[in-house]
Every structure is written in C-alpha cells, then in structure tokens.
C-alpha cells in the first residue's frame, strides 16, 4: 500500500576538484578533459565542467548544487571525457556516488580510481546541508516514489499586424513530460508538467531567429496567478506571453502497491462460492467448505502458436467434462495460449456452457486458407488502421502490423473486443480470472537474459509486480508521467495486445515480409524459415537484410513502422517515477530482481519513455510468474505445457529461476525414465515448504492415447491411425510456425489433449483433495 508523506529537501553541493594521471585518448596531444554530472532525481539534464586543454592532471575546482530528497535513491553519475571535436568525445572514467551515504551536515572528499590497476584518479568533494523549506509531498510503496508536479500553462498571442502562421516558435521546459513543443503563434495553450521543486525555466525562441529568446524561471512565478510578459525582439514586440503555474493533482492514476487490486479481491470473494460448490461435488464432501478451507487453484498455459491455442481448447473441454473447471480461480496464458483465452472471454458465460460451439469455430479458423491475409484490400485496411493509431498518439512499430495480420489469421473479421470488456465475464465469479503475460526488455542494448521484467495483463489491471505499479487495463497505452495520467488514448482492441503477447512469431513474419513482393513469395519464405527451425529455438532478433533490388510488401508500411521491428513500443506508465532509498532491500523488489541493472536505479524502466514488450518465450515459455506472488496464495497449479522439445524443459527453467530468486516452488526433478518416456501427468510438490504450490504437469505427449480413444475404451484396428499423433519437433504438423492445420491434424490434437486430461481424473481429484487438506492444516486452532 502506498504511503504519502511530506519530505523536506537537502542541498547537495558537489565540487569537482581535479584529476590525476588521466590517460590520453589522443594519439599526439595530452587530454582535453571535462566532467559531466547527472543526478536525475534533482535535475533533468547533465551538468558539465569547463574543458581543461592539454593536461593529464586537469584542475577544475567547480561547484554544482542539487536539491535532493533523502527519501529518494540519489545516485549521481560522474563521467570524465576527453574532448575530440573531430571523432567525438572519448569516455575516460565513469563512477557512481550514492548521496544517501552522506549525513546531513557532513562534508566528504572522495578520490575515485580509474580502475583497480590504473593510476588515474578523480577527486570530488561532497557536502550535504538540510534546508528549511516547506517540503514536498511524496507518495511511495517502498520501491517507487511519486513526487509533486507543477503544471505550467502558456498562451501566446501576437501583438502586431503579423500573421501568426508566419512565426513558428519553440517552447522548452527541460525535464518536462511534454518535452520541446513547436507551434505557430496564437495556436492555443501549451502545458508543461515537471517536478514542483525542480528549479526549471521556460525558454521560448523563434525558429527563424534563434538568438531571440525569452527565459522565465518557474520558481519566480506565483502559483495560481496569471503573469503577462512581452516577447523581446530586436525590432518590436512580437507576441504577448501569458503564464500560469498551478499545482498538479496529488491523486495518482498509477496504483503503487503490491498484491491484488480491490477489484480482483472482490472477484475472488465471488469466485470462492463457485469453487466451493464445485469442490463439494467433485470430491463428494459431506458438508460445505469454510471460506479458509477453499484452495486457490490455477491453470498455467504455455505458448506454442496454433498448437497451444488448439491444445488449450481440448484441455479446458476435458476439465469441463470432469466438472473441475469451476474449481479454478485463475488461468494464465502466454503467447499462443492467449489467443484461446481472448476468444473464449468474448462470451461472458463461456465456462458455464458446452465448449463444442467455440471448438467448432476454432477448427474453422485453424483449417482455413490464410493467403487472403495479404490480399491488397487487407493490406490497405492494415495501413489505414495503423495510420489512425499513429494519429491518435500511439507509437508505431512492427508488432502492430503483426497484430493485425495475426487477427486476420485467427478471425474472418476484425473484432472490437477489448481487454477491459472481459470484466463482464467476471462480474459474478462465473469464470476464472485470466492473466496474460509479457516481458519488458531494454531493446537491442541487452538480451532478455540480461534484462527481462515480467509484466502482467488482466481485465482489471496491467502492471509490474517487481515495482508494485499498476494501471487500469483501459489506460494501457495512454501517456503517464510521475504517476499522473497526461493524455488518455482510446483503449486498443485486444488484437494489439495479442500482438504483444505472441510477437515471438513476428521475427519469422518480418523476415518474410521484407523479402516478399507478393503473397506467394511471402508464404514460400515463411515455409523455408520454418524448415530451418527444427528444434523450435527462439529466433534471433537480427534479421537478414534482403538485396536492395528485392521487392518488399513491407515497403507499403515503411512510413508507419518507425520503431524497433520486434519490440512493442508502448508509452511507459512508469515514466518519471523515482526510486525509494531502500528499494533494493524491499522484499517484493528483491523477489523479482533478476537483471544486470537492478542495482542501477537511473537505468531501470522508469527512466525510459517507452516500454519494450515482448513475448515471454524470449526468456522462459511460461505464464506461471503471476501465480507465484505470495499475495495470490495459489495452492495448486495445473501446468499445461505445449512444448515439442522437452516435456520438462521449460518447467525446469522456471524451477531454477524460482530457486535463484528465493520464490517458493517445488523442485522439478523428473527421473531419467520420466525424461525419456514422459507420462500424461506428473505431480511435483514440496511438503517441507508450505509456501510452495503443488504442480500437476501435463506435457504434450501421446502415451496411452495410441491405444485408447477414451479412458478405458481401447481402439479398434480401424481407429489405430487416429491414435498416431506426430509430436516430433523436427517434422511435426504442429510446429509453431504452422498457421494452417489439416482437419485431421486439428481433430487429433483436440482429442489427444482432451483425453490426456480425462484419463488422469483420479490424479486431478487427489491433487484437489491435497489442496483442501493443506488449507485445513493452515487454519488457526
């Protein structure tokens, strides 16, 4: 839960003294060095000393002042550069200093070494003094901190006979949410939001006469009053400037807190009644379960393209047939399995109905000819929708095009359904709560193994468990700054979210589009790529460039697709937020910290203007992480794994991740026999760890299905062929790049996955009994 408090500021004085024995980056002359200082919690831009020419031991003796809050993690970056006007400045030394190590009133002199072996050193003095100011209103969950904002309104009006269209101006408030703004005089009001205690200034200049500038310090403006100025020019007044500074809202649009939101908690209360009734019937209990005896059961589905979507339909139908679907409170999906969930939740009562209808619709879409998705009329429709999104303010990226093509692959017509619409399917606890997973990364600078943060999407909220920051799902994609909603954009259709959740497939798609000049060439390239992915390895993010003479379908979208090809560029709702001084020790953050940058707050996600969201398959093909939050208190996970290469591979990766992070999870240790010949269902549990959920793992295997068409019903010789399902990773018709199945193949996969669930009814019931027993044992006596 977020806590609000008034925090007074301190004055941090940094005096850059001198350096000793700096190595020269120039071949002929000594170094021409300067030092930059960056403290993003106190200043929006880097400050810089003067340049000392031709010296390996430069003396600067320059002081810089920063107003800081001791509740924030104030990490200053100091860098020494060797100036080079020809080839660009060369970095010599980079060090970090945590101002939190200073006490109020303390003076300290630091000597920073160039390297453990090098002789070069940088000497800096630091002094921290308390200030007797009014303080600032801070809101924090112990990891992130939101600060007071001030809002500056600027109105420009012409004063002479000049036409406003003749004069273009640029307005800048450094560090503001809006950044530089350009417009003609008299075109309206401009707004700038920035932290209230920053000593910023408004700068206005004519674009055709940059020497003409107006500067207005914001700290000198009275709050709530209009201040009128006249723009100074060399000839005559050109425009009248009206300024009004107001305090920003204190109520945040971003929820800073850990654990389920109020809407999810209310849903769980409703769902418990459904679960209790289903468990009483399934387990043939004598009486009703008490509220604290009702276990939390979850389904976890992995990715795998059309294979995952089809298999999940079959397994859900099996659970429905056994009367066990109503025992489930959560269902999580990744990549291809999210397609199934998005389809099903268009019907608010889907789990209370026979799934035969949705399954038949699935078959129609999976078996249809896909050539039409690149027909000229479709390409034009994609272009129009992408252009409209850009006009509304959404960043453009390749994943948006993939989302529209993927929608055409899965549906005959565009669907207007949105993620927040799925709340209707939860209104009286009639269905499990769906949670969709994505991975936030750093783009091309780091791999997903070096930096990957789990992001979860539900009908109620989108957010990061690591940071304890969430927004209502209908606001995902809108613009935020310092926890405040700056610009609300219309909620995206869910196909654009599916594009994020499954853009592992966009790598192959993008390559094919780049090379193709007509649909037939596109599909030829797609199939050729599919043949090279015999073990379903994660595709590299580097795409081979086609010859310059190659015709490309992608050129049709060149002006609209300006972002990194495979990353979903989304406005960052964490933008501007700072870190609490003790964020690194916070139990929720420490549970999820697993990147190379977690100890560097200035480089974490709140510092980025955009999120870079990818398919979780780029790290681990699982959707389990939302279920492992202790506040969700999940007792039993039904693990539905659709991998063709290794029945336990992804689950073992997940187990290793949990072990490294200290997250309670049972050891995943299948025997050599199980590895070689996996069964339809495996149980993993850890009785010694009460916080670890039990896992009932269903790998995608064909075991007794070869001999039985239904539990206890042996196949006749005529039915033998129907029991042969090709699940080899090299030549399977269910390879993840396959977008069309034959009628026979889709029927086999549906029957197999349905059978594997129904054939393990007793194991499912026993796992549910154990979950109830576990709850009873935890009751206070």
Curated annotation (Swiss-Prot):
GO terms for biological process: arachidonate metabolic process; calcium-mediated signaling; glycerophospholipid catabolic process; inflammatory response; parturition; phosphatidylcholine acyl-chain remodeling; phosphatidylethanolamine acyl-chain remodeling; phosphatidylglycerol acyl-chain remodeling. Ca(2+) 1 binds at residues 26, 32, 82, 84. Keywords: Calcium, Cytoplasm, Endosome, Hydrolase, Lipid degradation, Lipid metabolism, Membrane, Metal-binding, Mitochondrion. Ca(2+) 2 binds at residues 26, 82, 84, 90. The active site is at 335 (nucleophile), 615 (proton acceptor). Changing residue 615 to A: Abolishes enzyme activity. The N-terminal C2 domain associates with lipid membranes upon calcium binding. It modulates enzyme activity by presenting the active site to its substrate in response to elevations of cytosolic Ca(2+). Calcium-dependent phospholipase A1 and A2 and lysophospholipase that may play a role in membrane phospholipid remodeling. This is Cytosolic phospholipase A2 beta. It comes from Homo sapiens (Human).
């Amino acid at each position: 839960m977020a806590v609000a408090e008034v925090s007074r500021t301190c004055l941090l004085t940094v005096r850059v003294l001198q350096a000793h024995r700096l190595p020269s980056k120039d071949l002929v002359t000594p170094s021409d060095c300067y030092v930059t200082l960056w403290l993003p919690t106190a200043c929006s831009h880097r400050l810089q000393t003067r340049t000392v020419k031709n010296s390996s031991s430069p003396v600067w003796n320059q002081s810089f002042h920063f107003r800081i809050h001791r509740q924030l993690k104030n990490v200053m970056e100091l860098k020494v550069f060797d100036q080079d006007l020809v080839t660009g400045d060369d970095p010599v030394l980079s060090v970090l200093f945590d101002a939190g190590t200073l006490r109020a009133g303390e003076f300290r002199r630091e000597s920073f070494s160039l390297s453990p072996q090098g002789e070069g050193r940088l000497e800096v003095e630091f002094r921290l003094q308390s200030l007797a100011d009014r303080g600032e209103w801070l809101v924090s969950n112990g990891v992130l901190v939101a600060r007071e904002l001030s809002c500056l309104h600027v109105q420009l009006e012409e004063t002479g006979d000049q036409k406003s269209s003749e004069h273009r101006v640029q307005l800048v408030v450094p560090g503001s949410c809006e950044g530089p703004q350009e417009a003609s005089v008299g075109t309206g009001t401009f707004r700038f939001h920035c932290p209230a205690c920053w000593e910023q200034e408004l700068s206005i200049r004519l674009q055709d006469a940059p020497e003409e500038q107006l500067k207005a310090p914001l700290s000198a403006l009275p709050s709530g009053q209009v201040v009128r100025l006249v723009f100074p020019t060399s000839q005559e007044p050109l425009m009248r400037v009206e300024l009004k500074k107001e305090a920003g809202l204190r109520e945040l649009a971003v929820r800073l807190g850990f654990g389920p939101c109020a809407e999810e908690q209310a849903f769980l209360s409703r769902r418990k009644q459904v679960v209790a009734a289903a468990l009483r019937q399934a387990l043939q209990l004598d009486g009703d379960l008490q509220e604290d005896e009702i276990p939390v059961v979850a389904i976890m589905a992995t990715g795998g393209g059309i294979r995952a979507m089809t298999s999940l339909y079959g397994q859900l139908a099996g659970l429905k047939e056994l009367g066990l679907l109503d025992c489930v409170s959560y269902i999580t999906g990744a990549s291809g399995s999210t397609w199934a969930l998005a389809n099903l939740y268009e019907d608010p009562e889907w789990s209370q109905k026979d799934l035969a209808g949705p399954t038949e619709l699935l078959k129609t879409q999976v078996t249809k000819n896909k050539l039409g998705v690149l027909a000229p009329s479709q390409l034009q429709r994609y272009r129009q929708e992408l252009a409209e999104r850009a006009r509304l303010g959404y960043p453009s990226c390749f994943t948006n095009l993939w989302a529209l093509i993927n929608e055409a692959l899965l549906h005959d017509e565009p669907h207007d359904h949105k993620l927040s619409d799925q709340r209707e399917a939860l209104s009286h606890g009639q269905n499990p709560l769906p949670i969709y997973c994505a991975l936030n990364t750093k783009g091309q600078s780091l791999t997903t193994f070096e930096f990957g943060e789990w992001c979860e999407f539900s009908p109620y909220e989108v957010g990061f468990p690591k940071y304890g920051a969430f927004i209502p799902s209908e606001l995902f994609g809108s613009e935020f700054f310092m926890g405040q909603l700056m610009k609300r954009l219309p909620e995206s259709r869910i196909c654009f979210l599916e594009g994020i959740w499954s853009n592992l497939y966009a790598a192959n798609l993008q390559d094919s589009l780049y090379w193709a000049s007509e649909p037939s060439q596109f599909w030829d390239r797609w199939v050729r790529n599919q043949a090279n992915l015999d073990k379903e390895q994660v595709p590299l993010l580097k795409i081979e460039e086609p010859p310059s003479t190659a015709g490309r379908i992608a050129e049709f979208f060149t002006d609209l697709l300006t972002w990194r090809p495979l990353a979903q560029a989304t406005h960052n709702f964490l933008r501007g937020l700072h870190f609490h001084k003790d964020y690194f020790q916070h139990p929720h953050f420490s549970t999820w910290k697993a990147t190379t940058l977690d100890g560097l707050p200035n480089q974490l996600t709140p510092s980025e203007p955009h999120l870079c969201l990818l398919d979780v398959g780029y790290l681990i093909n699982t959707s389990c992480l939302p279920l492992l939050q202790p506040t969700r208190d999940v007792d039993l996970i039904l693990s539905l794994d659709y991998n063709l290469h290794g029945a336990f591979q992804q689950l073992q990766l997940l187990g290793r991740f949990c072990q490294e992070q200290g997250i309670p999870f049972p050891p995943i240790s299948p025997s050599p026999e199980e590895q070689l010949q996996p069964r339809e269902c495996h149980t993993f549990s850890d009785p010694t760890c009460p916080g670890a959920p039990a896992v009932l793992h269903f790998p995608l295997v064909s075991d007794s299905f070869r001999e039985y068409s239904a539990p206890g019903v042996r196949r006749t010789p005529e039915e033998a062929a129907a029991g042969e399902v090709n699940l080899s990773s090299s030549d399977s018709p269910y390879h993840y790049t396959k977008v069309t199945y034959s009628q026979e193949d889709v029927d086999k996969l549906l029957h197999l996955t349905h059978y594997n669930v129904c054939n393990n009814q007793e194991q499912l019931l026993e796992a549910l009994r154990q979950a109830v027993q576990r709850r009873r044992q935890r009751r206070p006596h």
